[in-house]
Amino acid sequence: MSAENESPGLPNGGACCASATGHFLLVGNKVTVVLGAQWGDEGKGKVVDLLAQDADIVCRCQGGNNAGHTVVVDSVEYDFHLLPSGIINQNAIAFIGNGVVIHLPGLFEEAEKNLKKGQGLAGWEKRLCISDRAHIVFDFHQAADGIQEQQRQEQAGKNLGTTKKGIGPVYSSKAARSGLRMCDLVSDFNEFSQRFKLLAKQYKSMYPSLEIDIDGELKKLQDYADRVKPMVKDGVYYIYEALHGPPKKILVEGANAALLDIDFGTYPFVTSSNCTVGGVCTGLGIPPQSIGDVYGVVKAYTTRVGIGAFPTEQNNDIGEMLQTRGHEYGVTTGRKRRCGWLDLVLLRYAHMINGFTALALTKLDILDVFSEIKVGVSYKIDGKNIPHFPANQEVLNKVEVEYETLPGWNKDTSNVRTFEELPENAKKYVQFIKEELGIPIKWIGVGKSRESMIQLF
């Protein structure tokens, strides 16, 4: 490329094109996004794993090690909380964006645990890139999380059911402008130490029972700073170059899910970040036009961990059966998940916010034993249909769900590998969901392994 043709100020001479109005628009690679469409645990890890096989960069854009993704490769089950699960692709770069909050002991512990399981993580430190603008979770954030939960329990008789990973407190520090970022850790350590001491002091005054070994913590952080320094990059420029350089496949794996979003979820029983599509732009520093496909991951029924409204919940044999057959325990907390029928009101709402281009319907095989299957299609309050998903939790707790009953298929689908092989009623169930939501279904999951994802188009 000659010097005259190079776009000024664009890394790699990124291409431009003129619009009809004469303004210059950037064109580049698009990112593919995978998001949870319910309350988490939908099987996002499996969809990401499928797409990550030929990805060049796999990103996390929000949340911390409160997320839990399980990926099975060559019969080895890897658990990811903070690391993008695409890190098991030896040819991809795993990128942790500025919207993610990082607990350094948790990061290294997670990598070491997975290294012991199999070869998937070999050489991970060379494949991980961390935004210098990402905030750091300290041990006292985690301790404060536990104290806050205890206080909620004592004062209100119920807590939020957080993972006690310090996520809420660190996002609070970020919003209060007292947090510390990766760029602070790897720059002047004396300056970092002063700010760390000040933040620790603030936490001590808020929570007098908090014990913080400041010198011990700083010594550990100094060690982490040395280990992590080669991985820390200016995330904005890194992602910009990836978008506007040579063709690349860039994948974003969302953590948590739409109904756990701080703005759009079932507040206050939500996480502390935006886990809808807007969080991808703010958590990576990319413009909306760089977003390509947005895949929503939907479990064939609904689950929720912890407390909060759950209109289609089944506190009965059906819920028990779903729980047992689906092995519904949280990856991060080990807590039993609450189970219920699929809720289309909730999914329409998630689609309004995220604009899914296609869905992955997972765990269809869990429904194999039911003679009839119900699907929540609308909500009523005092006998009147409500046209929207209520923001207020008390209102959501009161809704009556209108169900559509579909016939079950009573056949094992776990070895099915094409849509045509599915039992007739299973096809009808998938078709019903697709038509009601108006979103194409691209994958159907009928088991744990990578091979058990049936691709439709």
UniProtKB/Swiss-Prot annotation:
Its EC number is: 6.3.4.4
Cite the Pfam families for this sequence.
Adenylsucc_synt
Q: Which residues bind substrate?
A: 41, 331-337
Q: Give me the residues that bind IMP, please.
A: 41-44, 66-69, 163, 177, 256, 271, 335
Q: Which CDD domains match?
A: AdSS
Q: Name the top EC class.
A: ligase
The UniProt catalytic activity note for this protein reads: IMP + L-aspartate + GTP = N(6)-(1,2-dicarboxyethyl)-AMP + GDP + phosphate + 2 H(+)
Q: Where in the cell is it found?
A: Cytoplasm; Mitochondrion
What UniProt keywords apply to this chain's record, in alphabetical order?
A: Cytoplasm, GTP-binding, Ligase, Magnesium, Metal-binding, Mitochondrion, Nucleotide-binding, Purine biosynthesis
For the ligand (GTP), the binding residues are 40-46, 68-70, 337, 363-365, 445-448
**Keyword Ligase on entry:** yes
Q: Which InterPro entries does the protein's record reference?
A: Adenylosuccin_syn_GTP-bd, Adenylosuccin_syn_Lys_AS, Adenylosuccinate_synth_dom1, Adenylosuccinate_synth_dom2, Adenylosuccinate_synth_dom3, Adenylosuccinate_synthetase, AdSS_2_vert, P-loop_NTPase
Which cellular component appears as one GO term in the record? mitochondrion
Under the GO molecular function aspect, what terms does this record hold?
A: adenylosuccinate synthase activity; GTP binding; magnesium ion binding
Oligomeric form and interacting partners: Homodimer.
| Family listed | Belongs to the adenylosuccinate synthetase family.
Instruction: Give the protein's recorded name.
Output: Adenylosuccinate synthetase isozyme 2
